[in-house]
Regions:
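Short catalytic helix/loop segments, enriched in acidic residues and glycine
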Residues: 1-10
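Active-site-adjacent betaalpha module
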Residues: 10-19, 43-186
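Short beta-strand segments at enzyme active-site cores
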Residues: 21-29, 33, 128
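Short, flexible, mixed-charge acidic loops at enzyme active sites
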Residues: 36-43
Length: 186
């Protein structure tokens, strides 16, 4: 899931670092005792049985290819959105950020929720179509859904409701001509 987006994310990180953009990583984690899982435990069994997204266990860390540098923020979140229950909005506002670029996984959950909340909070949103990814959905009573379809539909919804959906090349081109430091990669 998502490894094919690493090269684009690496290009984006290199550009953001060189341009002085604020880079913020968000990690979806839950407490070991499960006290913050809420409905996640009801709808997704890997969370319910503590097999994934548990703070301190392998699998929640940023992959080595995209490791944050010392000066880059890493925010742990307990819901899909990087804004919900975190200080992300305050951090961005204090840095006079007005645009958020969204990358990562999963397109339809964490990335989509973060993009929506960014827009709801008054930010311009760039959603990077080739730097976001997802996985195949099993049949939950509605038929299995391939990752490509989940991704395509989510991008279509975002494009007409929430964000400027673009690929890495377009983002780099547009960002090269705008003022550096006004955008945050999340």
């Amino acid at each position: 899931m998502g490894r094919d987006i690493y090269p684009n994310m690496q290009r984006l990180l290199a550009f953001a670092r060189q341009s002085g953009m604020k880079i913020v990583y968000t990690l979806h984690t839950h407490r070991e005792d499960g006290s913050d899982m809420g409905m996640f435990a009801e709808v997704w069994s890997p969370i319910a049985n503590g097999a994934c997204l548990v703070d301190g266990l392998p699998g929640i860390d940023v992959v080595p290819e995209l490791t944050p540098q010392e000066n880059e923020l890493v925010i742990k979140k307990h819901r899909y959105s990087g804004f919900f229950g975190t200080d992300l909005d305050m951090i961005l506002r204090s840095a006079n950020i007005n645009t958020v670029a969204v990358t990562g996984v999963t397109t339809e959950n964490c990335c989509h929720s973060t993009a929506r909340d960014a827009m709801f909070n008054g930010y311009r949103v760039a959603f990077l179509s080739d730097a976001t990814g997802t996985f195949d959905y099993p049949d939950a009573g509605f038929g299995a859904i391939p990752a490509s379809e989940v991704h395509r539909v989510t991008l279509g919804i975002l494009a007409v409701s929430t964000a400027h959906v673009m690929d890495t090349e377009e983002f780099l081109r547009l960002s090269s001509t705008s003022r550096a430091g006004q955008c945050s990669a999340a």
